Amino acid sequence: MKQQKPKISFIAAMLIVIGSSIGAGIFFKSSTVLENSQASLVLAIFNWLVASVAVIAMALALIEIASVRNDNLSIISWVKVFNRRWLYHGCKNFMTYLYLPLTFFFMPLYFICSIQDGFRGLLGLETGAHFNTSVDWLIWLALALIITTYFLTIPPLYAKVGNIQNMVVSAVKFIPLVFVPIIGFIVAGTGNGELKNVKALVQPPQINGATASFTQLVQAGYGITRFTGIGAGMGSFISIAAIFFAYDGFYVTAGLQSEMREPKKTPWALFLGLLITTLFYLILAVALSINGGLFSGMEESMGKLFNNKRAGQIVFGVVNLMIGIGVLGIINGFALWAPRFVEDLLAQGDLPFWKQVQGRLNPNKPVVGVIYCLVLSLTVQVLFTVIGALAYLPTVADYKNYVNTEIDKLNSMQWLYSFSDLMATWTSLFTFAFIACAIFGAIVNRKTKKITIANPKRYFLPAAWIAVVVNCISVFVTIIEPFINLFLLFGYDETVAHTVLGNDFIELNELVIGRVMLIVVLVFFAIISFLPVYVEDQYHKRKFGSLANYQQYVQQHLAHSTING
């Protein structure tokens, strides 16, 4: 039988890179980057450039790393090959028990948030569209569960449907990416935007029109990123970590080399694809930044531009619906992969119930993987929605318009959206931390040569070091920030905070809970990722005498299942 030739051309590969790395993430992170850059347009652009260089460097480094294994495990596989066993199991636990279900927790919520904005514009409402009940969160939960169930069943089991959905979404999601920069520059250029609130350079923080002192900022309860000097520096690296979220998914393309007609051109396809994505992001980031950082802030500005408030609302609504469709594209892409990586882990004996499903696994129709994903995702989705809507106190002011506070006294949707942001923050950070671990392990392997690299790349080491250094500093700064901010609350003065913040005043207990929760979730993620490794090892040592004996038992069982299958 003739061996099938790889079919992906250079242009097609470049388009795959662009399609997998560009998406709706920028609309959710642009304002965060501007805020952490202390409203400095120059610093915000610089942060986007540094993050983009780091992402391109990661992609180039991953070409060599991905060439070692050909499976559906992606990051998990790379960590397994180039790092220690405990780190592999930590990565596996994170991707299975946290990344997978939490993606189906907060991504449907981001879609719902976008359609609330969309219908707000289309219907001419003053606040986000809601059902005007005290249990709106339950109604939205029902929709979120339908989204998760659909995307975790139809696309994985009927790949053709998933591919068609990808094409449709790709066509739709590029419309906002082109339209928003154009309208953003026009709005700002005609004096209808928020350009006056954005400065070229970092400005010293102001309190009542005067430059604030360190003591005043501490007393008012500000976080470290609002401080002059060190605040801007830390804010830059936190911004870079946030920007990584906008590129999430680019690493899937690192395995393209084996599918290309001309494998030697893979680096150029990755480089040019990510470069085009970066240009899109930079232009869009500038357009959003000069209008306050959020597209939602442009609704009134577009009304002024068109000299028709209703026209501005309708355009705002249509674009937000398209952004929501872009979010569904992210869900669709992840849903195509998730059941397959779960089945690969089951096939290796690395997930619970692996013995019971041997002989039933099928990468083309991953029914077992689908069931596994549904049980995990739907359980977490319901549990975390209840916690977020009813028990999470700290709130993000931007979400106050997504619930009728006169009917829903708990502000449940504001709480829920704020809680989903908290989950998304650490989920993205852990993902890129594990990528950095895999790349660093590959750097070490260049010296030890424990893993044979068939085709070493000359550009690997410089790209790998850039990726690791930028990634590690960003992760480290993002981790220590909530600890510093919590410590700063010892200097909080309620009287000063009231005077400085006015209507934006936040109670001390809410500040404490918000900053403590960031740390609690970080610790929770670490425990869920790494504690099971220790517990399982102790159990297997006790039952089988040693880990080596257990691994031998697994291999014998898998071999027996293969023979019988």
Curated annotation (Swiss-Prot):
One Pfam family assigned to this protein is AA_permease_2
**The organism sits in which domain of life?**
Bacteria
How does it sit in the bilayer? Answer: Multi-pass membrane protein
Q: Key word Manganese present in the record?
A: no
Q: Does the keyword Cytoplasm apply?
A: no
Query: Where would you find this protein in the cell?
Result: Cell membrane
Which GO CC terms are listed, alphabetically?
plasma membrane
One term of GO molecular function: L-amino acid transmembrane transporter activity
Q: What InterPro entries does UniProt report for this protein, alphabetically? A: AA/rel_permease1, AminoAcid_Transporter
Q: Where do transmembrane segments lie in this chain? A: 8-28, 43-63, 95-115, 137-157, 167-187, 227-247, 268-288, 314-334, 367-387, 424-444, 460-480, 482-502, 516-536
Q: Which family does it belong to?
A: To M.pneumoniae MPN_095 and MPN_096.
Q: What is the protein's name according to its record?
A: Uncharacterized protein MPN_308
